[in-house]
Amino acid sequence: MAAQNNQEVDALVEKITGLHAAIAKLPSLSPSPDVDALFTELVTACVPPSPVDVTKLGPEAQEMREGLIRLCSEAEGKLEAHYSDMLAAFDKPLDHLGMFPYYNNYINLSKLEYELLARYVPGGYRPARVAFIGSGPLPFSSFVLAARHLPDTMFDNYDLCGAANDRASKLFRADRDVGARMSFHTADVADLAGELAKYDVVFLAALVGMAAEDKAKVIAHLGAHMADGAALVVRSAHGARGFLYPIVDPQDIGRGGFEVLAVCHPDDDVVNSVIIAQKSKDVHADGLGSGRGAGGQYARGTVPVVSPPCRFGEMVADVTQNHKRDEFANAEVAF
């Protein structure tokens, strides 16, 4: 079995390496038939369950993976900017969001994130104010949450790119409900401090802090400034999907001053994992907290995991004791 797994991993890495080389040679990552075809092939290769642990690959494969994630980030940004401009041409852009090819995926992802928050954050969840870090030119997640799940919540969307925020704000100009509850800010999360304490929930986009050490710094910064009891929603990846998005170690979240409440690794045709955490009350001023144990370390097997498949899946609150929770019906994840 181990030999078979090794052969499968080797074949996958070889395929991904070839796709990386082809994508890197493209003259542009703006939407086009060639770009769309290569990224479709890439996602198709990465989504199926795989024994690969991308964090344990050799240096050459790691370098390839890091470069590929940067290319994916650039291509995703260009795709979203393209559709944001297209949607902005309508008098009522929000009536035409279905033009974006992955809009339904955002609906499913946001539904899952909301239901995980409602299930695992003590006391249920009706946040008054939410921050989304890394919202981009198409803030679908904020829109879906505001329109479908959080009708009274105010949303502050943060992005490094002023042009992305300008594009995003145009989409909401004609909407008196959701548009009135959306604001957009151009800022680096590292420059946010006191304002973070006013949020009941902070969402951290998958591509904010692409290197593991950068992601850990962002999480520690959030832990230093978020209010005690506030929730953090982190998008991650698992298995071969780690070639597309950064993988977040739950222990880094613990070391950042949070208690991890739930982790979901979908195993269908989706990409992002979801981690739900809550600010610990014993967080230190430098953003490093104790988490569940000394230094934020988790005992092996005690990180609470939502077992795949998330669709009609079982909630596992304590892997060590194999304690099964109620079925989590009709929840799907996508990127």
Swiss-Prot record:
Keywords: S-adenosyl-L-methionine, Transferase. It catalyses: 3 S-adenosyl-L-methionine = nicotianamine + 3 S-methyl-5'-thioadenosine + 3 H(+). SUPFAM superfamilies: S-adenosyl-L-methionine-dependent methyltransferases. Pfam families: NAS. One of its GO terms (biological process) is nicotianamine biosynthetic process. The gene is NAS2. It comes from the Eukaryota. The keyword Transport does not apply. This is Probable nicotianamine synthase 2. It comes from Hordeum vulgare (Barley).
